[in-house]
UniProtKB/Swiss-Prot annotation:
Coiled coil: none annotated. GO terms for cellular component: chloroplast. This is Ribulose bisphosphate carboxylase large chain. InterPro entries: RuBisCO (IPR033966), RuBisCo_large_chain_AS (IPR020878), RuBisCO_lsu_C (IPR000685), RuBisCO_lsu_C_sf (IPR036376), RuBisCO_lsu_fd_N (IPR017443), RuBisCO_lsu_N_sf (IPR036422), RuBisCO_lsuI (IPR020888). It comes from Clitoria ternatea. NCBIfam families: PRK04208.1. The lineage of its organism: Eukaryota, Viridiplantae, Streptophyta, Embryophyta, Tracheophyta. Belongs to the RuBisCO large chain family. Type I subfamily. The gene is rbcL. One of its GO terms (biological process) is photorespiration. Heterohexadecamer of 8 large chains and 8 small chains; disulfide-linked. The disulfide link is formed within the large subunit homodimers. Substrate binds at N113, T163, K167, R285, H317, S369.
């Protein structure tokens, strides 16, 4: 019989429209833009091949393995509505292609070399269905939403945070002072900026010590549990763990990691340490837009969010929705549900291509941050619900009277919105009124309302959904 050398079309082996997917398969939805003259079936099959067992030519060693058992299969292709020459190619991967408990290995296969493939003009991974059998090989978030609430003793409302600004240049002592002011005023958390690691103007240990002092002082004064996301991100995993150990020894409740710049291997390492040592883990998504911003190439953020839930994190930044378009609201809420819920149904209108069952893997709190202030509070409370962290950087520190009054303004606004919602009022319609009413009793809130009043509150249109 021998082996037949030469190049043959991918679609002869890797395009299998009759294939019925298995419960154990990892399923991927790719947005494929083929080069002119390349049929969509060939492009979809090429993606399946190059991200699994295939190479550009038939090789002698193919005969030593069972391709049927190990190959990725393109099992369905559909054109993208409203786009010329774009297709969604669905690919199924057998579970045995992946190392257990390794997001790194999963991504190396699925979004590895295939993205540089010449027969495609562009390629984007839109969604991933992770089978329950693979999920069970991951630890996931160190603690999850319920355990975090129990640790903090805070229920029935979103949590409030604030990123300390200016992000670079403060000394450790002044940094700790800013942390203390915010926490004393009523915030639950303050946050290291993602690019604060250990620079000449503020070495990490000095920052950790002053922030710990700020936390304890604020806790003593307010009777509430407080936290500061101590950024443990470092140049090596060893250094990162050293910083996490120091945070634990200081009694800090939470550390932070930049999971995309740090990498999934480092992130999973830190997540395991955090669970073993009772630390919460806040995740920042710096660099995500490099990967997810192009509509036709890269990877959608919902895939990065799913990967983070597997790798491990208790909070992750997830956009704000406010003031953006309605489609974005639906799509953002789609991946917010993928982060928090145990079971999410397929829903293409929200960008969810597959039904995802998380089999009791703990959930992740979505963090809304970036350009938000007190007037956005009703919208944020309505959109994100209780299980979220609302982070106001400039919206706290930009208060004309200083950090603590800025924190007071945000806390009063939040409590007013939660109370109004619990009384059955419609936050979408009455949001402005609720904030105005509350500001009569809080001079701090009134001052904040005055500063940011020019920034429009674009919310009523949301009712049309």
């Amino acid at each position: 019989v021998g082996f037949k050398a030469g190049v043959k079309d991918y679609k002869l082996t890797y395009y299998t429209p009759e294939y019925e997917t298995k419960d154990t398969d990892i399923l991927a939805a790719f947005r494929v833009t083929p080069q002119p003259g390349v049929p969509p079936e060939e492009a979809g099959a090429a993606v399946a091949a190059e991200s699994s067992t295939g190479t550009w030519t038939t090789v002698w060693t193919d005969g030593l393995t069972s391709l049927d058992r190990y190959k990725g299969r393109c099992y369905h292709i559909e054109p993208v509505a409203g786009e010329e020459n774009q297709y969604i190619a669905y690919v199924a991967y057998p579970l045995d292609l992946f190392e257990e408990g390794s997001v790194t290995n999963m991504f190396t296969s699925i979004v590895g070399n295939v993205f540089g493939f010449k027969a495609l003009r562009a390629l984007r991974l839109e969604d991933l269905r992770v089978p329950t059998s693979y999920i069970k090989t991951f630890q996931g978030p160190p603690h999850g939403i319920q355990v975090e609430r129990d640790k903090l003793n805070k229920y029935g409302r979103p949590l409030l945070g604030c990123t300390i600004k200016p992000k670079l240049g403060l000394s450790a002592k002044n940094y700790g002072r800013a942390v203390y002011e915010c926490l004393r005023g009523g915030l639950d958390f303050t946050k290291d900026d993602e690019n604060v690691n250990s620079q000449p103007f503020m070495r990490w240990r000095d920052r950790f010590l002053f922030c710990a002092e700020a936390i304890y002082k604020a806790q003593a004064e307010t009777g509430e549990i407080k936290g500061h996301y101590l950024n443990a991100t470092a140049g090596t995993c060893e250094e990162m763990i050293k910083r996490a150990v120091c945070a634990r020894e200081l009694g800090a409740p939470i550390v932070m990691h930049d999971y995309l710049t740090g990498g999934f291997t480092a992130n999973t390492t830190l997540a395991h340490y955090c669970r073993d040592n009772g630390l919460l883990l806040h995740i920042h998504r710096a660099m995500h837009a490099v990967i997810d911003r192009q509509k036709n190439h890269g990877m959608h953020f919902r895939v990065l969010a799913k990967a983070l839930r597997l790798s491990g994190g208790d909070h992750i930044h997830a956009g704000t929705v406010v003031g953006k378009l309605e489609g974005e609201r639906e799509i953002t809420l789609g991946f917010v549900d993928l982060l928090r819920d145990d079971f999410v149904e397929k829903d293409r209108s929200r960008g969810i291509y597959f039904t995802q069952d998380w089999v009791s893997l703990p959930g992740v709190l979505p963090v809304a941050s970036g350009g938000i202030h007190v007037w956005h509070m009703p919208a944020l409370t309505e959109i994100f619900g209780d299980d979220s962290v609302l982070q106001f950087g400039g919206g706290t520190l930009g208060h004309p009277w200083g950090n603590a009054p800025g924190a007071v303004a945000n806390r009063v606004a939040l409590e007013a919105c939660v109370q109004a919602r619990n009384e059955g009022r419609d936050l979408a319609r009455e949001g402005n009124e609720i904030i105005r009413e509350a500001s009569k009793w809080s001079p701090e809130l009134a001052a904040a309302c005055e500063v940011w009043k020019a920034i429009k509150f674009e919310f009523p249109a949301m009712d049309t959904l």
